[in-house]
Amino acid sequence: METTKTQFESMAEMIKKLPQHTCSSLKGRITLYKYQDFWGLQNNIEGAILAQQSFKARPDDVFLCSYPKSGTTWLKALAYAIVTREKFDEFTSPLLTNIPHNCIPYIEKDLKKIVENQNNSCFTPMATHMPYHVLPKSILALNCKMVYIYRNIKDVIVSFYHFGREITKLPLEDAPFEEAFDEFYHGISQFGPYWDHLLGYWKASLERPEVILFLKYEDVKKDPTSNVKRLAEFIGYPFTFEEEKEGVIESIIKLCSFENLSNLEVNKSGNSKGFLPIENRLYFRKAKDGDWKNYFTDEMTEKIDKLIDEKLSATGLVLK
């Protein structure tokens, strides 16, 4: 479904009337708008509206869902390697020459590519950062499978801070972390508030565990083999005994490792299209747990711990 210039202009006018916040932490270079209870860039909201209006899911579709900077790139790489392993191995995979975001498109960003894949009977999972309550109705109506990856909120905040600073070309001295923390703490962040995003999918997973798999980033890092097997089985591509014996799982883990992907030429020097041109290297910063300790003051730690306890204490979900 093509979107006309008039439709885009109409959406742009509507978005301008929404509640908005100009990010002080990024020196006013980014403005977020609030639509259906989440904050997003103008193109995020345009993409969400178009997906809601025109995306038609199929019963066997699989969606990789996440809040930004929570392990999305890694999850995409793993899922893509799993579903294409009959065609490609660690020496021929398109992941060697494409950033994972080009292999698995976002429904709110690459709708045209997704429709082309559907028309060509090309199956790959799709991805989204959209909150659960904003998803196109067909995804929920057809009980499409979803995999949600989440991460320690403190590391998410630090990763988000650096990503925003880098894409807006702000040096460290001009982008105080304290301001970024404060905005995030008050729920003002892309696709946020973070806890609403997380809890939307979590509560849905409790109601429909057969269609929503929750993966904790730190757990996948600690035990990649078991979690890659869980992922493959859940999305309908389980490993055979022969594959396990031949080391296919280990090959996929190695192919998709941070060490491997971050050192590929495409991910060191390539660029991705978006609201702002984004260097692929920015998707591969550190991938380390606990980097937040280098940024958080004791007061910040206490504030965020108290906030998360208030938001999650009765849910059974653990972030630490």
Curated annotation (Swiss-Prot):
The protein's location, in the record's own words, is:
Cytoplasm
Enzyme class at the top of the EC tree:
transferase
Pfam families according to UniProt:
Sulfotransfer_1 (PF00685)
Whether Secreted counts among this entry's keywords is no
EC assignment: 2.8.2.27
Task: Name the keywords, alphabetized.
Answer: Cytoplasm, Transferase
Record field: catalytic activity: quercetin 3-sulfate + 3'-phosphoadenylyl sulfate = quercetin 3,4'-bissulfate + adenosine 3',5'-bisphosphate + H(+)
Task: Give the primary localization class.
Answer: cytoplasm
Cite the record's tissue specificity text. Highest in shoot tips and lowest in mature leaves and roots.
A GO cellular-component term linked to this record:
cytoplasm
Please name the InterPro entries in this protein's record.
P-loop_NTPase (IPR027417), Sulfotransferase_dom (IPR000863)
Instruction: List positions binding 3'-phosphoadenylyl sulfate.
Output: K69, S70, G71, T72, T73, W74, R151, S159, Y217, R285, K286, A287
**pH dependence, entry free text:** Optimum pH is 7.5.
Q: Name one GO molecular function term.
A: quercetin-3-sulfate 4'-sulfotransferase activity
Q: Where are the coiled-coil regions?
A: none
Keyword presence, Cytoplasm: yes
What is the activity regulation entry?
No requirement for divalent cations and insensitive to p-chloromercuribenzoate, iodoacetate, or iodoacetamide.
List the active site.
H129 (proton acceptor)
Query: Which family does the record assign?
Result: Belongs to the sulfotransferase 1 family.
State its role.
Sulfotransferase that utilizes 3'-phospho-5'-adenylyl sulfate (PAPS) as sulfonate donor to catalyze the sulfate conjugation of quercetin 3-sulfate > kaempferol 3-sulfate > isorhamnetin 3-sulfate > patuletin 3-sulfate, but not tamarixetin 3-sulfate. O-sulfation of position 4' of flavonol. May play a role in auxin transport.
Q: Which PANTHER family match?
A: SULFOTRANSFERASE SULT
**Record's protein name:** Flavonol 4'-sulfotransferase
Q: Which organism is it from?
A: Flaveria chlorifolia
